Amino acid sequence: MSQPLLALNWKMNKTPSEARAWAADLSSALTPGNAELAVLAPAIDLPVLAGALPAGVALGGQDVSRFAAGAYTGEISAAMLRDVGATYVIVGHSERRTYHAETDAVVAAKARQAQAAGLIPIVCVGESLDVRERGAQVDFTLDQLRGSTEGVGENLIVAYEPVWAIGTGKTATADDAEELAAAIREALAGLYTAEARSFRILYGGSVKPDNIASICAQPNVNGALVGGASLNVADVVAMSDALR
């Protein structure tokens, strides 16, 4: 099974000076562990972090344009992210789908651009509370997965993020996470020629130091996409230690 990934999504937090201080604190506190760490920061922070993160900690973006270049004011291209040192980029986060009306087709286009530039897309999928209450979470999430990976190569990561658990303090149980992660892995095996076990599947949704170990102990969960807890270095170190 693949090395677990602790993907730290800062969302719209931290100025460049705050990012520099955070990276210095992490350098002092972090000890090598079993999990790979990746900081997914606002684009304006990436140049600062590229020269300040501890060795072995990867860098990534939170979004990317579906276009390669051109007259798209305010957009960040995959080539720009790659040039600044990014390895990963999130596509299709539920906040982008909700606040910016991103469709599965748009998400797939962004993932294709990311791969064309040498980035690894972290494709986010997951259901809302009303879908879960209807018992349709597996069908909904797999439909979203298929639409969001249309024409996308197999060098990707999938993050299962139940929308009802993001920023709410509610967390899917370890069994909930495993149910969807197993279904996603089976679906990926049908979509790609790579071995099913080679794909990394993350869980995202109110992940904290006190629940990450039980969630990531599930056989089909290979790490976590962490939001709020990623902003505090002590929490990051605790989560990294929990994945030893």
UniProtKB/Swiss-Prot annotation:
The active site is at H93, E161. The keyword Amino-acid biosynthesis does not apply. Pathway: Carbohydrate biosynthesis; gluconeogenesis; Carbohydrate degradation; glycolysis; D-glyceraldehyde 3-phosphate from glycerone phosphate: step 1/1. It catalyses: D-glyceraldehyde 3-phosphate = dihydroxyacetone phosphate. Pfam families: TIM. Its EC number is 5.3.1.1. Keywords: Cytoplasm, Gluconeogenesis, Glycolysis, Isomerase. SUPFAM superfamilies: Triosephosphate isomerase (TIM). GO terms for molecular function: triose-phosphate isomerase activity. GO terms for cellular component: cytosol. Substrate binds at N9, W10, K11, G167, S206, G227, G228. Homodimer. Belongs to the triosephosphate isomerase family. NCBIfam families: tim. Involved in the gluconeogenesis. Catalyzes stereospecifically the conversion of dihydroxyacetone phosphate (DHAP) to D-glyceraldehyde-3-phosphate (G3P). This is Triosephosphate isomerase. The lineage of its organism: Bacteria, Thermotogati, Deinococcota, Deinococci, Deinococcales.
